[in-house]
Amino acid sequence: MFLDYYLRIKIKRSHMDILEIMRKQDPLYPTFEQIYTASFPLFEQRTEEQQEQAFQSPNYHLVAYLKDNLFIGFISYWDFSTYVYIEHFAIHENFRGQGYGGLLLEDFNKRLNKIILLEIDLLRMKFPPSD
């Protein structure tokens, strides 16, 4: 049942499971979608049709990181011959600020051993901040 949907790998140091979500019917997809929509503005999100198209590409991967069966975060990326492009990366709001983001990226880097491109959008804030 699990293995039909997931690629299961252990991160030894943190005892996390890395599970690949390969389609919208995956049992983890609703949790991914909840974190995704809460973490990214609408203009940076894929439509349902675009997500289905991405799943059809052999270069596209969406991996969920779980610890003790709790969905910690995800990385969606495109894997090319000499580099990897991380399109979306988010940690569930309940686990932010606890070092999971760095741990996931460190593991990701070790497993893929390629150049990693990661786009980062700056927060738009007024300076100086007003009350």
Q: What name fits each language-model region?
A:
Residues 11-50:
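Short amphipathic alpha-helix that is part of the acyltransferase structural core
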Residues 39-67:
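Active-site rim helix/loop that mediates acceptor-substrate recognition in acyltransferases
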Residues 64, 69-78, 82-90:
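Conserved beta-strand in the GNAT
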Residues 89-96, 122-124:
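A short, internal acetyl-CoA/4′-phosphopantetheine-binding micro-motif in the GNAT/acyltransferase core
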Residues 95-107:
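Conserved acetyl-CoA pyrophosphate-binding loop and the N-cap/start of the following alpha-helix
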Residues 112-130:
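Conserved GNAT acetyl-CoA-binding A-motif
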